[in-house]
Amino acid sequence: MMDRSNAAFVLTACFIFSQLICHVAAITRTYYIAAVEKEWDYAPSGYNKIKGVKLEDDSDATVFATKGAHRIGRIYDKVLYREYEDASFTKEKPHPKYLGFLGPILKGEIGDTIVVHFKNNGSRVYSMHPHGVFYSKDSEGALYEDNTKGKFKKDDKVPPGGTHTYSWHLTQSHAPADQEDKCITWIYHSHVVPSKDINTGLLGIMLICRKGALNQGQQSGVDKEFVALFTVLDENESWLLSKNIERCSDPTRVNPDDEDFKESNKMHAINGYFYGNLPGLDMCYGDSVKWHLAGIGNEVDIHTAYFHGQSFTIDGHRKDVASLLPATFVTASMKALNPGKWMLNCLVNDHYNAGMYTLFNVTKCPGKVGVAPSVSGGKKRTYFIAANEVEWNYGPTGVNGMDGQSLIAPGSDSAVFFAQNAQRIGGTYLKAIYEQYTDARFSTKVPKPEHLGFLGPVIRAEVNDIIEVVFKNNARFNFSIQPHGVFFNKSNEGALYEDGTSRAQKADDNVQPGQTFTYRWTVPEEVGPTKSDAACITWVYHSSVDPVKDTYSGLFGPLLTCKKGTLNNDNTRKDTDKEFVLLFTVTDESESWYHEKNKEMKANAILINDDDEDYKESNKMHGINGFLYANLPGLEMCLGDTISWHVIGLGNEVDMHTAYFYGNTFTHQGSVKDTVSLLPGVFGTLTMTPDNAGDWALVCRTNDHYSAGMQAKYKVNTCNRNPELKTSGKTRDYYIAAFEMEWDYAPTGLDALDGKKLDQSEEAKVFTVTSDKRIGRKYVKAVYREFTNDQFNQQKLRTPAEEHLGILGPMLHAEVGDTIKVVFKNNANRNYSVHPHGLYYSKAHEGSDYNDGTSGADKLDNAIQPGKTYTYIWKVPERAGPGKDGPACATWAYYSDVNPIKDTNSGLIGPLIICKKGKLKEGTEERSDVDREFVLMFTVLDENESWYLDENIKKYCKNPGDKETLKADDDFMESNKMHGINGFVFGNLKGLKMYQDEKVDWLLLGIGNEVDMHTVHFHGQSFLRKQVSYHREDVYDLFPGVFATVEMVPDSTGDWLLHCHVNDHMVAGMETLYSVLDKSLKTTPKPITAASSFVTSSIFIYLSFPVLAMLLKA
């Protein structure tokens, strides 16, 4: 009988043999690709094909598409990747029309090698840099100081007329995870100066597939594959701008810095086409379709791609909208079951107006059989809904519910929006809203829950149901109802665009005042919740005659589709005690159909300048369900209730929201959270069982939105239930002080990625060089630091493993069941606190300063005075951990919450890590399940919002002049926005070192403002994100108030770039290096443990059959 050691040895040998077989079966896929200069037309038809008008007759399109004395128009010179037949680069391969300006699609299976022979036919240096594959330093194609030279630098910038051969290996360490699609989406692009290279046009898509997924280069089991890249191509940032200016009829008088000229060159495109001009998105009714979707670009590049008339799945979840940020790549699986011409558009309002839409065509093809989705055995649910005009008050109490001040108190944040005078409308506006009636007479309204505010009634249905909406338009403008998440034909879509239908089929799209139309929608299995979804998934309906003006006018509501058996006979939920809907949006009343009427009613219209920035700002109402500054009523529940929160985002580029629920956590798609990020057209279902009684804040964690009133409160009553939460684990003591120090954002004095001194770098000196009216790289800040005892007489020195933390406070570790005790001393010169995310705390230990109905001792934690000490006690229940479907440890944060905007920008934030039981070494806070963990905070620390701005001006500016004038200067304010990682810029973050094949956890933190959308990209490696199942990525999307854990086993040695992929953030220094050392350099070999036994097939691909034979013989 074989003993255990021999059995293990044979199993290992068999595994190696299987890897070798895979490697033998692998192939080399060779591509010949050149960078070539071509003329590119963004709208070759000359028409807005969605509206059916010439571009010059469309007021929105003329901004971008009309050529003039000082306008380039719609045709630009670009440099594009194109594929050729062979190394002679003489015969270009056919390029699918729908790919537009994108390069060819590169495909390969795990085990393959992709070899790209690249020729640069452009007029300056370019390269090819891939995402999602294994490469060595001579095939990275990215220019930065990575401590290589010679042959390892030739890939970084290929000169004009030059060639380079890139070899990219598709190892198991970059394979699609088990529950992912067979082929996952990545990109490749030039990375010499990536922001300019990409805007010039050098970008393409790459698909990495499981073994056996491709059949003669095509994905098996898929009828059609399409690629769609959403981006605002900024031609101002193209290398060919000067050449393109020559296209103007009076080029010598063009001012490239003119704001209107720059705006005209921002092309809101899908695959390089706008206003419906993207061709070739044709499929057959019944086709199985894969959509490979990507985003790239800058801070404006928040895209939500909406497919009318169809649904799809991403990561097993039912959707009809895909969220795309710079360097976000997703694969969507669609069954084309709804014939017709359908719109594909970005739901961000400005992007829609700027032409980011096209048509895709689902046709009944000869010989192709499609089965129409049908419903049977369900109910017919009828709703009578009217569009009514009402006066809406965004602050009906007249009071800021968070601090008790009047909404019109002079100098308050709220007065900007609520003060009424001859040139300001104030807080009450005429709007159109959806309201429900009892029957078709539209005489008796159905009462609605007060928390819904200006939202329309909740439409609910189960799978197999029919929804009938009898809609009456009582308003003065044409309106409609367009739904998400249900099945409808062209006569029931409710969206007005040129889709080839007859006039009779368009009655649903444009319901006139006083008219009635009946919509009929169904909920077949094909559009219902998947097994991975919540019992009811969240959608919206809204008017779509003009989707921008209609929604800003107030016409939207929630729609829920539920699994069979979820609803009671009265349409309420069986599985929940309460259900709440929350819409986070900045309602731009200047874009409402009623804007002119509101000026007449509430102000003196003659005196108002519509283009005045302060006036426009006063009309941007940062609300939750149409209420600001904690005026939202009705969010009340009992301890232990099952609560379903349905959260919705709508709006514009600024509508990047992170909803934060103080005091309790929820589950969302298998993850335990207390924040959820929302973009326009993003909807989510959250499940909460509140265990913490009290009045709790519910806010948007984006700083400007918070200060502009996107705040509410929800109340958890005890309802005679026991609120006591018991923990049985350890008590972990931490001694933390806040104190002021001088912080240096770039202590080396170098732009480490460029190899230049800071004052010699055009980009770096904007932020880091001191002058008469510039602070430079050093600022006084407040930071959290750990001490050894409650006397605070000895600061705890940071170890080499903690060097990377930078400005962050200490890592606080605990396991589920533990209690955390933080003895906090405020050694700074103003009030601060410590507030944790995710944990269980009483009101006396929340560390947050707002009106929560408490007094006395329960208020002492809110703001600790200088020189004082306070002890916070936080418990760690199961719902504070990563959950059964999450990673080993969940990432949270703690920060001062007296004034969360100024406190965090002053520097007071740190990481909080909560692990499953048994993941911390006995007697320590060290992890037992990983070799290393690193915390990375990506944020633009806005020193203009620091408490210490005046002190920093006085201390560091050499000749500041009038302080208030300086503080209002745009260039000065920009110089104080430090685009950092852990408080370091331009490659100055140190300490990110690891060895090959170690298990590494990266703990990611996001905080900040509207610009703080960060796409964290690791060169050289990929990582796994766990959300029920694993997902392979090399870019992670971070928003303010979002915290995440990702897992990596690095296999490619070298010094690698780690950066935010948002263009302006890269340019402003949000990048650094991390080092992967050869495993042979480890001084002390570690025993094989669960943490170090990760194996990737790339380790074995160099083994030979003789080696295997020796192993087996032994």
Curated annotation (Swiss-Prot):
Which residues are sugar-modified? N121, N236, N361, N478, N489, N831, N944
Tissue specificity statement from the Swiss-Prot or TrEMBL entry: Component of the acid-insoluble and acid-soluble organic matrix of the aragonitic skeleton (at protein level).
Where Cu cation 4 binds, per the record, is at: H303, C346, H351
Give the subcellular location.
Answer: Membrane
What GO terms in the biological process aspect are recorded for it?
Answer: copper ion transport; iron ion transport
Cofactor(s) listed in the protein's UniProt record: Cu cation
Query: So where does Cu cation 2 get bound?
Result: H131, H189, H1061
What cystine linkages occur within this chain? C183-C209, C284-C365, C536-C562, C638-C719, C889-C915
Keyword annotations:
Copper, Copper transport, Disulfide bond, Glycoprotein, Ion transport, Membrane, Metal-binding, Oxidoreductase, Repeat, Signal, Transmembrane, Transmembrane helix, Transport
Spans traversing the lipid bilayer: 1092-1112
Topology of the protein relative to the lipid bilayer: Single-pass membrane protein
Q: What is its EC number?
A: 1.-.-.-
The protein's matches in Pfam families, at most eight in alphabetical order, are given as: Cu-oxidase_2, Cu-oxidase_3
What residues bind Cu cation 3, as annotated? H191, H1019, H1059
Q: Which residues form the signal peptide?
A: 1-26
Q: Could you tell me which residue ranges the Plastocyanin-like domain spans? A: 27-210, 218-365, 380-562, 572-719, 730-915, 924-1114
Task: Describe the function of this protein.
Answer: May function as a ferroxidase and may be involved in copper transport and homeostasis.
Q: Which family, according to the similarity comment?
A: Belongs to the multicopper oxidase family.
Protein name, please?
Hephaestin-like protein
Naturally occurring in which organism (per UniProt): Acropora millepora (Staghorn coral)
